[in-house]
């Protein structure tokens, strides 16, 4: 997940419903095409809903998603844009989608930025010297080889920075103290992440020589969180590092003493030339309208500190497994289900923007888009952005997922960061909320590793996307164009 589009605040869902339906037999013959509608003017027939329920139950006992994630984290690991790990991830994804039975598997080239992390450090030099656990923010420039040392000016957020006279900032190191709040819907991220995105640029405008931020995360361990910064033409670039939450507490405690506090920061990160990566695509061809597609999206890149297990290895695995199970269903959907594993979400959405540009002429044939990029946690709610007369179909799709705990939450889907580039072209989208209470403990840290992922949560997510994609691809009228699409 990038700084480009943090999750929007959404309402808190009721407690997760218990799984209640026993799995029906999977070996029955395919339903006849003339099956009776479930109700007068119902969006789906009894046969379609039964197929979706069978797919749900099969997904809930299938570990393709979990084993796909194991393979990605074991055989590739970290895969930041432009790195050797990125190239390995593209090769891995091509092989994996083929092994899962997807068709038309191919790579579409994407040019990506290439930032290389180097060693860094932050040290309290007075009044009480101590080392602090730190990482460079993505895109940070280097310090001089000997580092930078200056007095610390604490500010809570960008609003407070704007109220401070520049004379207090000039020549100093700005420390952003704001703490991210834990929330089921992840809304604390959106409120906190602006200082990571624009904190260095705004401090530089006021003469700061460096920036340190409290990690954008909800944990209390000493592994700091990285993440991308957002620069604009004309911005003066200064070094920017994140320190862990306990180290930020220590720094605040020293500041509370009333004595001047000084920091020394060293960073040796650098930029290299742009690199070649790729969006990796595979399909389950539709039985009647193969040129019309439902997109299942996730981003293949990750940050370089951990394995990228939750962000977004889980999404890659979930969407790949959902497509594989759709391909094994008794009845293939009318339209094609297309998995798109996007390049470089973390450093500016290069893959999603390239896909939207290269496929703009086919936007009308994109029937629906969905994205998984909030880890593998309990699915809680469904949002959509479709014409009002198509909402009954969305609610019928949600009803198949009620036994997993998914409620319908609103008509305000965005497609999230990557698939949102398609929503801007008028492609209808669905968003699946998951419980984000723990996600930001690991997000963008060395702790984002395979052991943090619960196989049961992977299965539930696979079930949700398999059902949603199958029904969306088989829905005869289609979903038209997204309201307010361009």
Task: Give the role of each language-model region.
Residues 129-130, 145, 238-243, 248-249, ...:
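Metal-dependent peptidase/peptidase-like ectodomains
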Residues 13-25:
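Bacterial N-terminal signal peptides
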């Amino acid at each position: 997940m990038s700084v480009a589009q943090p999750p929007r605040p959404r309402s808190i869902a009721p407690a997760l419903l218990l799984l209640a339906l026993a799995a029906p037999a999977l070996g029955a013959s395919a339903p006849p095409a003339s099956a009776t509608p479930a109700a007068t003017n119902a969006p789906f027939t009894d046969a379609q809903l039964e197929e979706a329920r069978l797919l749900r139950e099969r997904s809930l006992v299938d570990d393709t998603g979990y084993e796909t994630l194991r393979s990605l984290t074991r055989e590739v690991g970290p895969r930041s844009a432009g790195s050797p790990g990125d190239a390995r991830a593209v090769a891995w994804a091509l092989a994996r989608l083929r092994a899962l039975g997807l068709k038309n598997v191919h790579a579409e080239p994407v040019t990506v930025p290439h930032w290389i992390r180097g060693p860094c450090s932050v040290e309290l030099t007075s009044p009480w010297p101590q080392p602090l656990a730190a990482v460079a923010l993505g895109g940070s420039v280097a310090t001089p080889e000997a580092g930078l040392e200056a007095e610390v000016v604490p500010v809570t957020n960008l609003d407070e920075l704007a109220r401070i006279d520049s004379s207090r900032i000039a020549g100093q190191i700005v420390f952003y103290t704001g703490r991210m709040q834990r929330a089921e819907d992840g809304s604390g991220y959106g409120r906190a992440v602006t200082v990571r995105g624009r904190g260095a640029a705004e401090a530089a405008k006021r003469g700061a020589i460096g920036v340190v931020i409290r990690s954008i995360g909800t944990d209390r361990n000493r592994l700091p969180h990285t993440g991308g910064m957002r620069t604009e033409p004309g911005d003066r670039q200064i070094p920017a590092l994140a320190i862990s939450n306990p180290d930020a507490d220590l720094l605040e405690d020293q500041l509370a003493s009333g004595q001047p506090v000084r920091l020394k920061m060293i960073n040796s990160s650098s930029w290299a030339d742009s690199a070649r990566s790729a969006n990796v695509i595979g399909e389950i061809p539709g039985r009647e309208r193969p040129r019309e597609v439902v997109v299942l999206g996730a981003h293949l890149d990750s940050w370089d500190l951990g394995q990228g297990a939750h962000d977004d290895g889980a999404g890659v695995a979930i969407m790949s497994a959902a497509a594989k199970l759709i391909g094994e269903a008794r009845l293939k959907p009318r339209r094609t289900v297309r998995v798109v594993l996007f390049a470089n979400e973390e450093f500016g959405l290069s893959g999603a923007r390239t896909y939207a540009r290269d496929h703009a002429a086919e936007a009308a044939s994109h029937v629906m888009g969905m994205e998984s990029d909030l880890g593998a946690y309990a699915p809680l709610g469904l949002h959509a952005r479709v014409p009002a007369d198509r909402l009954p179909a969305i609610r019928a799709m949600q009803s198949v997922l009620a036994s997993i705990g998914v409620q319908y939450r609103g008509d305000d889907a965005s497609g999230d960061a990557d698939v949102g580039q398609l929503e801007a072209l008028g492609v209808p989208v669905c968003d699946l909320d998951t419980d984000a209470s723990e996600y930001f403990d690991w997000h963008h840290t060395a702790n984002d590793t395979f052991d943090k992922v619960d196989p049961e949560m992977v299965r539930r997510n696979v079930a949700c996307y398999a059902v949603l994609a199958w029904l969306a691809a088989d829905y005869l009228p289609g979903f038209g164009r997204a309201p307010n699409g361009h």
